[in-house]
Amino acid sequence: MMTPKPLSAELTTPRGAALRGRRGCRPAFGAWGEDLAAQYVESLGWTIIARNWTCDVGEIDLIARDDQTVVFIEVKARSGTGFGDPLESITTAKVRKLHELALAWLVNQDDGVHSVRIDAIGVMVRPGAEPTVTHVRGIR
């Protein structure tokens, strides 16, 4: 597991402050978490291939390329620890679903994918603190 990394101010204010703690903004908060995760992924030098890719099976939050590896990324954002760490909500069933989704995406590709991996990124926002990112590579 990677140590949480602080994110740039451009995505942490004021939009983030406006979304914290407001139940009616859950979809917007999730999208904001995905924005932060995408910024983090790009800071690693990876290329975002797709965001919110959907098919009949479901949705993949982010698909990125890390050199010769295509990485399918599940993003979870939380505004506190009342329901646990963001990554704790990724169940075995969700991981199976991510594998199905990755296969569905790969079936339609013809650009010579060499390897694939499924990662998880948790975004935590605590009151009065900068958001942090936790990245787990190769979830199973």
Curated annotation (Swiss-Prot):
SUPFAM superfamilies: Restriction endonuclease-like. Pfam families: UPF0102 (PF02021). It comes from the Bacteria. CDD domains: PoNe_Nuclease (cd20736). InterPro entries: Restrct_endonuc-II-like (IPR011335), tRNA_endonuc-like_dom_sf (IPR011856), UPF0102_YraN-like (IPR003509). NCBIfam families: PRK12497.1-3, PRK12497.3-3, YraN family protein. This is UPF0102 protein PPA1431. It comes from Cutibacterium acnes (strain DSM 16379 / KPA171202).
